[in-house]
Swiss-Prot record:
PANTHER family: UPF0182 PROTEIN SLL1060. Keywords: Cell membrane, Membrane, Transmembrane, Transmembrane helix. This is UPF0182 protein Arth_2749. Pfam families: UPF0182. Residues 490-519, 896-923, 975-1006 are annotated as: Disordered. Residues 495-509 have a biased composition (Basic and acidic residues). The keyword Coiled coil does not apply. It is found in: Cell membrane. Its main location: membrane. GO terms for cellular component: extracellular region; plasma membrane. The chain crosses the membrane at residues 18-38, 64-84, 115-135, 168-188, 211-231, 260-280, 287-307.
Length: 1006
């Protein structure tokens, strides 16, 4: 038969059909490799520019070395297991059927045998190396560990053994066991494939070489298993599976001795395997292995179960007492609760005249602005341009104003690229022109204007106020919580400005331009760097645009928390970074924690669950990761400059052994806190997430007597936030207050406790009040002695002090309050409950809640209209806090609130919350009708003004509305006096459940 004619012309070479696939593979590998290189090299540039290249180099060298060690161990063990088994193969298989089957398998494998013998160890080595490299922190902590100077109560070993040595030994042992198991399986399969192990009718045949190989492998495995059993003895004090953490009675008297026996038994059986390899008889190691398995089941499982069920359970409280004591003391030490100051607080519920006189300074500082509701007011009054924004939750800090410390609600005006109009949405605008925000905006926490707006301390464009101006501090915000992914800044000297800086003025249409002059990011002027960053951010514009010049810098990774996490990978970063004006710069202050889950006898806590509250649920604060810890320290205070992004880490808890170990690893990355300026010291706060973890633990661990702890009769819970619909915990609150044992007020972080919530129900009465001193002083490098001091007020149950839920219910169900709030709701306005603050003043507990009104419309914002207060069973309700307190405390509280200057802006209530006797029901009804008509007219006029954007007219109508409401309240009180209805001030609140219409609405964001 003739061969088909070729389609290729004579003389032309035949094409190589197989060349395309390898070429594509090579090209793909080159592309992937260059992308990987681009990401690595840009990281190098980022760390070098920031001054933390040591961190990048140390971490990645550690990862590489550990990866190579893990890869080498797995590769060598697996390769030689396969190689030894292959070279030990018999020349002929005695059984013809088996020989035929093996020949068939071997024939299929032979063409790729060398590839498989090397490829499989390489593949498993890559997996093993990657797994090992992820444990780099354990390795470095072990190599650089520092002693705690404290020993555990069971083995009397330094705590550092459990936090830094035992995790490393556990990792190494577990890794080696995995290597031996994988290598052993590979050896067995190879022996079987080449006939050294054969399954026959008479049993399993094993060649002499295979016996020796398997015996040695088994001996090594058993020796490692014995080491693992021995280490398990120490791990028992880290046990968190029981009712209490640590080694309990059964662990100490059954599990630990059993682990010792099993460790010795495993070593003996390993010796039997070696003997079997020498003499060729397997009876003893087989019997030994069987006995080891039986012993591990009986002694490791059955025996401890018998002890627990028949010895411990009948007398659990007695037998576990000393171990509960260990759990209590070690948990309190691990979480920094061992130095808490506890005080019995015999709180009164009687609101007597002048009761607040001893707490005059605290009363004057009570915060009325809710940082979670006032953001829209900041936006409407201070945003100026659509491309600016404020965060949904503002921050609470303090500044010295006129010689006095003033609680302040503060935020920075950040850039919002999404606010650009459609015709502005170009790459050049988003990354070269609009690059930064501008200015700090701050308002007094305890005051507001007569029409309910914030009273600003710092505001405007240009930025002016008590915190400084453009000439005294740098107002530009290049690094913030909502900054763009990246921006290109900088230009040669003398070049025209390209960056949009700020509006020329509030009313003017002009804009000013600016050129970044700091050192904020890697240089991106060279062609090579342009290519790298174009690949990193997948943008050809970055490579081709004329907006990138020889002096250009690229700013990225701009979130303060992200920057701290990158330069300090060993820290867990607090969910709330906050800005402060410090030494002429805007600094983001970030708290960092060193944590561990290996502290002996300490209770485990899930960070995400312990720190969850209404703030994290609503997304206002970043939630912490879902990781377990049983040791935590606020070891680092970090600052991130909002202008150039520079990061400074201060060793705040310089006595923390974990931090000391990391300082040994990264010796140049942290500065001592003695280098912190006085201005920075004055803005340091006690961190929220640490406080939330501590209060969660205190719910149980305020009890230190083991018998009471065992019964759990005095356990507490953090109350739910009564201002939101969801059943989530109330967040802690920053405020300036004076605790009963303090000489003067201090900036503190506070929370309260109610009886333990069981099956979703609890008595909502106060059992405890916790405050953490957040005042670090204002001296350079000197930490105030009182900073971080936890103070716990324990309230006796018989005091019957209402909890936050009860206080909110009293507000909602009071008929006078309901009437006024229903009037405020007319005209489609929403009534918003502000944060419900709890303060230990007047010999009892005072509740304060601002009430905001928000009308409909895109340009509306909340204005503070009323203040609710409660003390015991009485409540007050007035346009100002000062007036409400006077209502509550018999006409005169004894102290002035911060908003006392606003008194009289609306008709005040009668002294003591009472009204003169009505002269006639007809007159009172007429007054009430007239007041309601005035209120309705003011609401309608306000809505019309708001629709026109006339905020001045809207403010005037709000004043008229407030005055009309007060007239209505007075008129209703006159009518009520004739029918014995409650008066509007200082009334005993009914406990009836309010109607839906009479209940103040929670914040819409919740």
């Amino acid at each position: 038969m003739s061969r088909p004619a070729s389609s290729t012309p004579p003389g032309r070479p035949q094409p190589r059909r197989g060349a395309l696939t390898p070429t594509l593979i090579v090209v793909a590998l080159v592309v992937v490799g260059f992308i990987f290189f681009a990401n690595v090299w840009t990281d190098v540039l980022w760390y070098q520019q920031l001054g933390f290249f040591e961190v990048f180099l140390t971490e990645n060298l550690a990862r590489i070395i550990i990866f190579l060690a893990g890869f080498a161990l797995m590769f060598v063990a697996m390769f030689y297991a396969i190689r030894i088994a292959y070279h030990a193969r018999p020349v002929y298989a005695p059984d013809s059927e088996i020989r035929d089957n093996l020949n068939r398998y071997q024939a299929q494998l032979e063409p790729v045998r060398r590839v498989v013998m090397i490829g499989l160890p390489v593949l498993f080595g890559l997996f093993a190396g990657s797994a090992a490299a992820s444990q780099w922190q354990k390795v470095l902590l072990f190599l650089n560990q520092e002693p705690f100077g404290q020993n555990d109560p069971q083995f009397n070993l330094d705590i550092s053994f459990y936090l830094m040595t035992l995790p490393f030994l556990g990792f190494v042992t577990g890794f080696l066991i995995s290597v031996v198991v994988v290598a052993g399986i590979a050896g067995i399969l190879t022996h079987y494939l080449y006939g050294s192990i054969r399954i026959m009718e008479r049993g399993i045949f094993t060649s002499r070489a295979a016996q020796i190989h398997l015996a040695v492998t088994g001996a090594v495995f058993l020796l490692l298993l014995g080491v693992n059993f021995w280490l398990d003895r120490y791990s028992s004090v880290q046990n968190s599976n029981g009712r209490w953490a640590g080694a309990l009675y059964t662990d100490v008297n059954a599990v630990i001795p059993t682990k010792s026996i099993l460790a010795v038994a495993a070593a003996l059986v390993a010796i039997l395997f070696i003997v079997a390899a020498v003499i060729g008889k397997w009876r003893l190691p087989v019997i030994g292995t069987a006995m080891l398995v039986i012993t591990s089941i009986l002694a490791g499982g059955v025996y401890p179960w018998v002890i627990q069920q028949f010895q411990v359970r009948p007398s659990e409280q007695t037998l576990e007492r000393q171990f509960i004591e260990r759990n209590i003391s070690m948990t309190r030490a691990a979480y920094g609760l061992d130095k808490i100051q506890e005080k019995r607080y015999n709180a009164t519920t009687n609101a007597t005249t002048g009761a607040l006189a001893p707490d005059a300074q605290t009363t004057a500082n009570i915060r009325l602005l809710d940082p979670n509701l006032i953001s829209d007011a900041f936006s409407q009054l201070e945003q100026y341009r659509p491309y600016y924004q404020f965060p949904s939750a503002l921050n609470v800090d303090r500044y010295e104003v006129d010689g006095k410390v003033q609680d302040t609600v503060i935020a920075v005006r950040e850039l919002n690229p999404d606010g650009l109009s459609a015709n502005q949405q170009s790459w050049l605008n988003r990354h070269v022109v609009y690059t930064h925000g501008y200015g700090v905006v701050a308002a007094k926490g305890n005051k507001f204007t007569a029409d309910g707006k914030p009273e600003f301390l710092q505001a405007g464009i240009p930025s002016t106020g008590v915190l400084g101006n453009d000439s005294t501090y740098q107002p530009r915000i290049y690094f913030g919580e909502n900054s763009p992914e990246y921006s290109i800044v900088g230009a040669p000297e003398g070049s025209p400005h390209r960056e949009q800086d700020r509006p020329a003025g509030k009313e003017g249409d002009g804009e000013t331009q600016y050129t970044f002059t700091g050192n904020g990011g890697p240089n991106v002027g060279s062609f090579f760097n342009k290519v790298l960053y174009a690949i990193k951010f997948q943008s050809s514009d970055l490579l081709l645009s004329d907006g990138v010049n020889a002096e250009s810098q690229i700013l990225y990774d701009r979130n303060p928390r992200d920057r701290v996490e990158k330069v300090a990978p060993y820290l867990t970063v607090d969910g709330n970074a906050y800005p402060a004006v410090v030494d002429g710069r805007v600094k983001w202050i970030v708290d960092g924690y060193t944590t561990s889950q290996y502290y002996p006898y300490s209770q485990q806590e899930q960070l995400s669950a312990a720190t969850a509250d209404s703030q994290t649920t609503a997304g206002r604060t970043v939630a912490l990761p879902n990781s377990s810890v049983n040791y935590i320290r606020n070891s680092v205070k970090a600052t991130v400059d909002a202008y150039d992004g520079s990061v400074t880490l201060y060793a705040w808890d310089d006595q923390d052994p974990v931090l000391k170990a990391w300082q040994n690893v990264f010796p140049t990355s942290l500065k001592p806190y003695s280098e912190m300026s006085g201005a920075l010291m004055s803005h340091v706060r006690y961190p929220e997430d640490l406080f939330k973890v501590q209060r969660e633990l205190l719910g149980r661990y305020h009890v230190t007597q083991p018998d009471n702890f065992y019964t759990n009769n005095d356990a507490w819970s953090v109350p739910n936030d009564p201002t939101v619909k969801e059943e989530v915990k109330q967040p802690p609150f920053y405020m300036s207050l004076q605790m009963p044992d303090q000489d003067k007020p201090a900036f503190q972080l506070t929370s309260s406790f109610i009886p333990q919530v069981v099956n979703g129900t609890a008595r909502n009465v106060l059992y405890g009040f916790l405050a953490a001193d957040s005042d670090a002083g204002n001296q350079k490098g000197v930490k105030a002695e009182s900073y971080g001091q936890l103070r716990l007020l324990q309230i006796p149950p018989e005091a019957q002090v209402p909890g936050p839920g009860q206080a909110q219910n009293k507000f909602n169900s009071d008929p006078t309050v309901s009437q006024a709030l229903n009037l405020l709701r007319q005209g489609a306005s929403a009534v918003l409950n502000g944060n419900l603050l709890t303060l230990p003043v007047g010999g009892g507990l005072l509740y304060v809640q601002p009430v905001y009104l928000r009308s409909t419309g895109e340009t509306s914002y909340p204005t503070l209209q009323r203040v609710l207060v409660a003390f015991g069973d009485k409540i007050g309700f007035a346009p100002t806090l000062d007036e409400a307190l006077n209502q509550l405390f018999g006409g005169q509280s004894g102290a002035k609130a911060g908003d006392f200057a606003n008194n009289g802006q609306t008709p005040p209530p009668a002294a003591g919350g009472s009204t003169p006797p009505a002269t006639g029901g007809t007159d009172a009804k007429a007054e009430l009708k007239a007041a309601l008509d005035e209120a309705n007219a003011a609401i309608r006029a306000g809505q019309e003004a708001l629709a026109k954007g006339d905020f001045a007219a809207y403010g005037e109508q709000q004043k008229k509305l407030s005055a009309a409401l007060q007239k209505a309240i007075d008129a209703e009180a006159k009518l009520g006096s004739e029918g014995a209805s409650p008066t509007p001030g200082a009334t005993t609140a009914p406990t009836a459940t309010p109607s839906a219409a009479a209940t103040p609405s929670p914040s819409p964001s919740n």
